Amino acid sequence: NLSAASTYQLLVIGYNRSDYDFASGGGATKRFNIGSTGNPATLANLYLQPVNPTVVPEFFSCFGNGYQGTTLVGPVFKPSQINYVTGTLKRLVSGLTLEVTNIPAYVNSMTLIAEQLVTATRATDGTALAWQTVGDSGTKTLATQAPVSGKVSFNQFLLAIPDSRKTLFYLDVSYGIFTERYTVKLPDTPGVVSGNRIIFTPNHWVKVTGSYANINIGFTLAGNINLDDNAWDGLQ
């Protein structure tokens, strides 16, 4: 029950039902936690935190707008002022697609690795609230693939990564008993890439493509889209 004398603002969080069981506090198979960086919890410090920083669920959120009939009251209201609430969820996470083609047959596998990952995002707008700590500051393995028809294609959800902590990616190439690490090199692009480090904003999809022959030279930024329609082609 809501107090009639109090004023409310309603935040709605969207996620895959199998990723979190709200009724049981998350459940044994939950993929993320809901918490806050301070006490009491407020909209400014409420966060969503993947259990595994390299396995990011798809998050959405929005503020509800209160209505009295067809009249918009707004996002802040008293219960007596409204008779229903509506809102449009917006994706909080970012996406990365990295494709490498023309991979020689002697390559057994390729592993995508990242450093300086964001570990918790603000529930209201996707702002980064926590990062890898000093004791956990190393690189993180995102995925490993064996080439198929000379190609690998990595598709990853990531928490939004601000310019101040933009992320460097690596590819570990394994062949026989040897593994070599290559930095994913990209041309500088304002607001997206600087010094090979990539910036991700909420609902932002970055696509990187390149031939194996250029793995030590540099790849191409083939896609850089901040989508308002919440539809990402190729990233499921």
Locate predicted features.
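A short, Gly/Thr-enriched small/hydrophobic beta-strand-prone motif that recurs across taxa
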Residues: 89-101
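Low-complexity, Pro/Ser/Thr- and charge-rich linker/hinge segments at domain boundaries
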Residues: 41-47, 190-211
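Hydrophobic, glycine-enriched assembly/anchoring segments
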Residues: 199-236
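Residues at beta-strand starts and edge strands
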Residues: 6-8, 83, 92-94, 108, ...
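Intrinsic-disorder/low-complexity, polar/charged segments enriched in Ser/Thr/Lys/Arg/Asp/Glu/Gln
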Residues: 84, 95-97, 153-154
